């Protein structure tokens, strides 16, 4: 009888995969790296914070295996747990850059962001994704989703960034959990009590049909290990996060104004071949094309008068308003959009894939230039799209394409400067903003930065909204306002004096000056990664203290 992989705990899964006796756990339970943010909320922590990291070999190939414990906080990512993954992948990247091949294997059993640490989770997931994009230049990054919790939220965006994804039939993979979709969009959009609907939409068998999972294996340690070995030896890579034209040309053929039948989608997908898709065109018009904070700031930072895009929700344009010629990007609402779940500015399928297409075009244009153009990201995104069609097709893949394209540009030498002028929420922020080299934010009460709406967070964490608000007074990372967000060290520049979102002459001048400073800082430091987020003064002294403690521990133990 073969040994079940699904039934094992995270540490057992890691040990089962590694060659005996090569496994060596790093920053383990005896290091007592617990999550102080959980303790502050009266939540019992774990001494390993639900993440197991071990170095060793699999079939004599050097690996670092990272596994999430789904039974602790739903496998959610907070500051300490995220920092362990970031530190391990950082070392793996350095090893590969130095010619020492080491394969990252990531076992996902996670609901995504740990809502009790919210913004720490979003920051960590963006930094993990950045490292995966960098690592794939050297080795395949292999993901495994055994089952139990499955893979949801921002970590599903991460799964789509990986080279190759292996699951058992007990796994589910999606961005928005069924309960969250029901909370945000209503039971008619997705009935979270309908188990057949859930498994037929996001279950592993359907995910293979939908080309979201690469390999489905029968549940056993031996089968999972064999699939991992084959992926390493054959250097398998589905390039799922570099597939914008494929999906854009597919979406153009589908009627997404109503829920699609699963079989109809599978047939359309199976028949589809990639076709070239024209880039959006942005022109000036006599009247505004839409109304939003992001639209106003795009107009102000490009100098375009009443810009209108052939893709109504996705905008980009050249700008000479900064110290260097730049490209400005944004995502805006369209109240008449046939894809009804993105009418208020949410980031959906088209938005993710279109932004990736635009960014990849910029990458190609500047590939042979010594100096790469800055990208100025105007951030005003209320959330990702919560919808049945979005989950069926794989909205997390769309968001991964956008995130990967931003990361690719930054790693190639483009300063990517994010300007938070409106809301910056959840997967939308991961796709459009959190891969920025530097973040700048207005000091406006109207800005919300978070992983989930209060209503959904209340339902998932089983706490009242009043309890969530009370906890936020102790733990800045779960607050919803931009001033608490600034305490985390994530912002390069917090514009105290810009207390409203309007594009007055003074406000625009202040933002342009801050963007110019950020571009200069990136150029001066030759910074192509995201380490500035946790090495700046605010982060070191207050915002990312635990992140830096984990980094020190990992440095001590990596080669010990």
Each model region followed by its residue ranges:
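Amphipathic alpha-helical segments at domain termini/boundaries
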Residues: 1-29, 33, 183-309, 462-560
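N-terminal short beta-loop-beta anion/metal-coordinating cradle
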Residues: 43-60, 309-324
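A short, well-ordered alpha-helical element
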Residues: 49, 77-100, 345-369
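STAS-typified acidic loop motif
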Residues: 58-83, 322-353
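Structural motif
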Residues: 65, 103-107, 142-144, 166, ...
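Glycine/small-residue-rich phosphate/adenosyl-binding loop
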Residues: 92-106, 129, 133-137, 371-374, ...
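Conserved catalytic cores of soluble enzyme domains
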Residues: 112-241, 387-506
